[in-house]
Regions:
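Interdomain hinge/linker segments and adjacent boundary elements that couple functional modules
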Residues: 2-15, 19, 23, 29-33, ...
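Positions that flank functional sites
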Residues: 36, 76, 208
């Protein structure tokens, strides 16, 4: 994991407070009335939409009969929701994913069009951003490239998450930038795929129709049992997450079908190496 994420900590604190309230057989309305706050405040804290102060946590947990070390742990969790993570300096960029990625224990990715940002070289990332965000000045492009490279660096600083990615074979042939950019990108990808925490598979053209035809998605899992998995979708201009249990089950099943249809990791690596060599000779 790459560090503490205030967003994940808010979700975790909210989940624990909701469980404590339900175990105390109290409704949101009853808690709000006893603490003389609005129903929406309690609801938003429990849903992880807003941070709770240590005082909020103390007042709520006292109602639920919590004392001692458990109380102190909850208050500390509330303090952690106020911390500024390294990515806070990149306001204005899509930050939902990195907020979850920072505390992930495993990340499952399906990419049918372009390589995920965690695998991109600077030149490959720059070429993509330049095409997708043609409205950006050069410094705006460079800021985004820098952000992606920092994400990669931070993920390798501490215990990294398990990464399992399935990429469509089309990615190997779609010319992003020029042949030399693609050559270096695929060589870098081969090196990354050999890391002990990374599994990479290629979904071949020969497989025909597959379970991922609806588009790219990422499933993020966390080490804490109270943290529900998150499904992440990103498109130009917006990002969206789901943590509904039914949706999570569906996308886990989709990913299982996709990786079952993909080439085995060792075969995928050979294909990547061959394609990198072809591009290097152009």
């Amino acid at each position: 994991m790459a560090g503490r994420s205030p967003k994940v900590r808010r979700r975790r604190l909210g989940f624990e407070l909701r469980q404590l309230r339900e175990n105390a057989d109290l409704t949101i309305e009853q808690v709000a009335a006893l603490l003389e706050v609005s129903d929406s405040k309690i609801s938003r804290i429990e849903n992880g939409q807003v941070s709770a102060t240590p005082r909020d946590v103390r007042d709520m947990a006292t109602l639920y009969g919590v004392k001692g070390l458990r109380m102190e742990n909850l208050k500390q969790l509330a303090r952690e929701t106020k911390e500024k993570p390294w990515w806070s300096e990149y306001s204005g960029l899509k930050l939902d994913f990195v907020s979850y990625e920072a505390e992930a224990s495993s990340i499952l990715m399906f990419a049918p069009m372009i390589l995920p940002g965690l695998f991109q070289t600077p030149d490959y990332a720059r070429a993509i951003i330049r095409e997708i965000r043609y409205d950006l000045p050069s410094d705006g492009i460079e800021r985004r490239v820098e952000f992606r490279m920092k994400r990669q660096a931070h993920l390798s600083e501490s215990t990294p998450p398990e990464l399992w990615a399935v990429i469509d074979e089309a990615i190997l042939h779609r010319m992003i930038g020029d042949p030399m950019i693609m050559h270096h990108q695929l060589k870098s990808l081969v090196e990354t795929a050999r890391l002990p925490n990374v599994t990479l598979q290629v979904l071949p053209f020969s497989g025909g129709a597959h379970a991922g035809l609806d588009g790219p998605f990422i499933i993020i899992r966390f080490p804490e049992p109270t943290d529900r998995d998150v499904i992440y979708f990103e498109h130009t201009g917006w990002e969206h997450t789901l943590d509904d249990p039914k949706a999570i089950s569906l996308y886990r099943l989709l990913f299982d079908h996709i990786r079952a249809a993909a080439l085995k990791p060792d075969v995928s690596l050979r294909l990547l190496s061959e394609r990198a060599e072809q591009l290097g000779n152009q």
